[in-house]
């Protein structure tokens, strides 16, 4: 779910440099605003391994509710609202305009993959994106992700997640044994590519 964290981390940035870094990090705020140079950099980047491609496609399918191979404005808004993030029609229109590089009014898998790729060498942006993604899961803002908070977000994006399953997922990354995920544990998990994308059985 590294990509989902990307999608939800850009809402409400007031300065253009924050918006220009792209739509990355949905998983979970909103303001994805790639510049053409960001899209070109993502396209020129070395190919991603199959696991990253599979993850990108899996997240894309979460957005593409009707399965037609493209994300519509309504699908984009519905997903964000389903995880409790109010987005205005203007925000959705801006996201669509900035992500839709071919101007057809939809986001294709290729456009989605291009805007999901982090810009090369931008460690500060990556850290900021992780903080925003963490904040989406940490609904009460107390600095840790609980099993219930994790289950809420996963259910919001269409994953059938119980609190018990989320406890097991947390156990896999909980280094201090408190049954919760703090930001440092979250960073390690995302860096390892574990994510929350696969529900424990």
From Swiss-Prot:
Ligand binding (Ca(2+) 3)? 138, 140, 142, 149
Tell me where in this chain the EF-hand domain is found. 51-86, 87-122, 125-160, 161-196
Q: State the Pfam families in the record.
A: EF-hand_7 (PF13499)
What PROSITE patterns does UniProt report for this protein, alphabetically? EF_HAND_1 (PS00018), EF_HAND_2 (PS50222)
A GO term, aspect molecular function = calcium ion binding
Q: Which InterPro entries match?
A: EF-hand-dom_pair, EF_Hand_1_Ca_BS, EF_hand_dom, EF_hand_pair_protein_CML-like
- What are the binding positions for Ca(2+) 4 in this chain? 174, 176, 178, 185
- Annotated stretches, region: Disordered: 1-55
Nucleotidyltransferase listed as a keyword: no
Return the Gene3D superfamilies for the record. EF-hand
Q: Which residues bind Ca(2+) 2?
A: 100, 102, 104, 106, 111
Provide this UniProt record's keywords sorted from A to Z: Calcium, Metal-binding, Repeat
What is the annotated role of this protein in its UniProt record?
Answer: Potential calcium sensor.
Record-given protein name: Probable calcium-binding protein CML15
What is the originating organism of this protein?
Oryza sativa subsp. japonica (Rice)
Annotated gene = CML15
